[in-house]
Amino acid sequence: MSIPIKYMVSSVFEYQNAGGMKDNLKIEINYMIRCHILPVTKRKVNLPWLSEDLSVLSVAPMEIFASKIVALINRTAPRDLYDIHNLLEFGFFDESEQNMLRKCVVFYSCIGSEKVHNKFAFESLDKMPQNKIKTDLLPVLNFGAYFDLKPAREKVINYLQNLLNLNPQEQEFINQFGKGHFMPELLFDGDILENVKEHPMAKWKCDKTRKNRSEQEC
């Protein structure tokens, strides 16, 4: 998805890694997603070279994993499959949290995808080849780590098919968003609705959709 440059600051920092190779760290500040569904959390960061306690503000874990689920569906990267498989293996969210997780996925799917899809499809996951695990995932894991694609993929797909069984209100949110109408009250209420009702990315995408539809009708 192409975000106007005035809404984003992007910096690339080059460095030499422990192996003596040139690498880079890219940091992007996207002002269009500065509103969050859930309150931010304070998390401790453990750095081997720092003796003092360090804590940073972080997006709520549920929103992070909702975004990862959307990324997995959209780009089918091995690292996203690995992350969602770990979500299931370690039981990060219990049954009572699945409803909110689904709503977060629906929300971020609409604002974060190039095209709004009326339903979630997982066919691309079935086509992920084992060699992509070797080339794209294993190099960033601990030495000697192994990831068995077939059972992990099956487990993740089964989970997502159950999780993303949308109710009528959630489906209507997607339908309306695809027409350029942002109606967060179909997903949320109370404080959460207040948090997102003026979400800049959602409003920008809906404005853009309505403008494109209007131009096509002319």
Regions inferred by a protein language model and the residue ranges of each:
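Structured mid-to-C-terminal alpha-helical surface segments
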Residues: 1-218
